[in-house]
Amino acid sequence: MKGGLGNLMKQAQQLQSNMEKAQEELANMEVTGQAGGGMVSIVMTGRYDCRRISIHSELWQEDKEMVEDLVAAAINDAVRQVETQSKEKMSSMTSGMLPPGFKLPL
């Protein structure tokens, strides 16, 4: 029984180390959200910081509300990409280490 507990503790420590490394990688990653067929693009980090907003020059002749809607849509697209990549990264880190049917709230 003692060996099993020691093995479980090693797995938990390895999981913690892997999770910390994954969180750092995710924080440093950048995704690009787009809207309007690429007319608006947002570069966002894994920490949801907006690094860059690019608006195609043709849009400046359009109405203000449409540009605002496209910026919001591009931000939402970037947020969804960060969430998807975070979930994929974390689930790959924990696969095989958790009991069957147990999921982390990611």
Curated annotation (Swiss-Prot):
The keyword Lipid metabolism does not apply. InterPro entries: YbaB-like_sf, YbaB/EbfC. GO terms for cellular component: bacterial nucleoid; cytosol. Its main location: cytoplasm. It is found in: Cytoplasm, Nucleoid. Keywords: Cytoplasm, DNA-binding. Disulfide bonds: none annotated. Binds to DNA and alters its conformation. May be involved in regulation of gene expression, nucleoid organization and DNA protection. NCBIfam families: DNA_YbaB_EbfC. Belongs to the YbaB/EbfC family. Homodimer. This is Nucleoid-associated protein Noc_2594. It comes from Nitrosococcus oceani (strain ATCC 19707 / BCRC 17464 / JCM 30415 / NCIMB 11848 / C-107).
